[in-house]
Amino acid sequence: MRYARTLPWISAGLLAALATAALLPGCQISTNFRGPGYSSDTGVTLEDDDDEVVVVVTYAQLDNTRRAPFDAHSELVVQSLAAQPGHIGYSRRKRLFGTEAWTMTIWRDEAAVEEFLRSPTHRAAIRAGQGALERAKFERFSWPRNAVPPSWEEVDARLERAPWLDYRTR
């Protein structure tokens, strides 16, 4: 008789666990926005007279079987950001148990973005990680300096309009 009373609780717990497991692949997790030119208390701290900054966003769908070099080089790029001239901050996001990854970096100006894109660390990451890319979207836009960072909802709305680049056919 004692077991008959615990069975409904076990079933309810099992159902809750299954429901949670079914939802997790749709969940996204992001890092807090941080960087050498940003304070969560005061906003952008990098000295500049311009009222706008440049936001660069990448959204990648990855081949899980070829993902290890992509992830390793992404870490190296993140570690290099603090030393990049004009870098304000960044956030990363990924889908739990999924194959999607996003990056948002914010820069003083276009010249700083271009210098970063030409950096040896970024160029090596592109070469090493490209094999894992299935599809990607890239977006670059100006953003008010006093409103950094944009929300991920704002970023998603802009990415919605961006074209896909299909790497499976390259």
Can you name each region flagged by the protein language model?
Residues 28-33, 110-138:
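An amphipathic, aromatic/His-enriched active-site/gating alpha helix that lines ligand/cofactor pockets
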Residues 2-14:
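Bacterial N-terminal signal peptides that target proteins for export
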Residues 15, 46-47, 136:
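Generic detector of short alpha-helix boundary/capping microenvironments
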Residues 14-20:
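Core hydrophobic alpha-helical transmembrane segments of single-pass membrane proteins
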Residues 59, 104-107:
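Short hydrophobic/aromatic beta-strand micro-patches
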Residues 4, 63, 67, 119-126, ...:
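Short, structured coil/loop segments at alpha-helix boundaries
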